[in-house]
Amino acid sequence: MITSAHIDDIRTQVRAWRAQGETVAFVPTMGNLHQGHITLVKEAAKKCDHVVVSIFVNPMQFGQNEDLDAYPRTLEADSQALTVAGAELLFTPTPAIIYPKGLAQQTYVEVPGISDVLCGASRPGHFRGVATIVCKLFNIVLPDVAFFGNKDYQQLLVIRTMVEDLSLPIEIIGVDTIREASGLAMSSRNGYLTEEEKAAAPALKKAIDAMAQGIKQGVSIEQVTEEAKASLIAAGFTPDYLEVRHATTLANAEPQDQALVILAAAYLGKARLIDNLRFDR
């Protein structure tokens, strides 16, 4: 696997592949990789001739009092795992390479509406940071296809909307959430959990599953939501949000909506965990 922090190196290699008529898949990450990331890379390798991965802890998507400095950097282990998974090109830029003028002077991309609710309301500016870095990475790598995890459901919709609105010639593929044996969605932030918290963490998925089951049985959204919040609090969580939305627009769910998604974010100790479930009523 070739590794470089330099934009020109990435573009040169991708151009060489394209000159041979070969296809390129891209998996953007912030490193500290787990099996969910590796699954994205393996799916990308099935789809295209070559796989490019980026590792960049993006300061633009971290808010004040968030864990930018504490976010784990595990480049050596990540590189080994990516090589085994089938990645051929790894882009590891510094903030100075990505944002040479600094964040205050950086042109940014903002997807209105869908970026402002749920995680966007809890973390102002987060999705502006996500959209900006992903758009910039797309312009550097110029992939045919890009892969993202369905665990970050709102992020995936933001990126799909950006690609559509800006007419970017890139196919976006979402890959099912990879889970621990306990049912906990794999996340780099799971490393913040104590053993006691890890034992409690599966309550998040259980609460979401119970909400979906109740809605399918005709119980009101308000009732299932209150019951789920109570179960999370009893398990030691501090809920951030727990909501039922239209599956493609993230508008508040209406009685006539069939395609729904439950989205949840909750704190367990120092970790902010998110999860979701898309289902038909």
From Swiss-Prot:
Residue ranges the record marks as coiled coil: none
Subcellular location field: Cytoplasm
GO biological process, alphabetically ordered: pantothenate biosynthetic process
Catalytic residues (UniProt): 37
Residues that bind beta-alanine: 61
GO molecular function, a single term: pantoate-beta-alanine ligase activity
Listed GO CC annotations: cytosol
Binding locations of ATP: 30-37, 149-152, 178, 186-189
Highest taxon of source: Bacteria
Keywords, alphabetical: ATP-binding, Cytoplasm, Ligase, Nucleotide-binding, Pantothenate biosynthesis
Cross-referenced InterPro entries: Cyt_trans-like, Pantoate_ligase, Pantoate_ligase_C, Rossmann-like_a/b/a_fold
Pfam families on file: Pantoate_ligase
EC top class, as a word: ligase
Pathway(s) annotated for this protein in UniProt: Cofactor biosynthesis; (R)-pantothenate biosynthesis; (R)-pantothenate from (R)-pantoate and beta-alanine: step 1/1
EC code(s) of this entry: 6.3.2.1
Catalytic activity reported: (R)-pantoate + beta-alanine + ATP = (R)-pantothenate + AMP + diphosphate + H(+)
Leader sequence residues: none
Record bears the keyword Nucleotide-binding: yes
Biological function: Catalyzes the condensation of pantoate with beta-alanine in an ATP-dependent reaction via a pantoyl-adenylate intermediate.
Family to which the UniProt record says this protein belongs: Belongs to the pantothenate synthetase family.
Assembly, per entry: Homodimer.
Name of protein: Pantothenate synthetase
Source organism of this protein record: Shewanella sp. (strain MR-7)
Highest classification ranks of the organism: Bacteria, Pseudomonadati, Pseudomonadota, Gammaproteobacteria, Alteromonadales
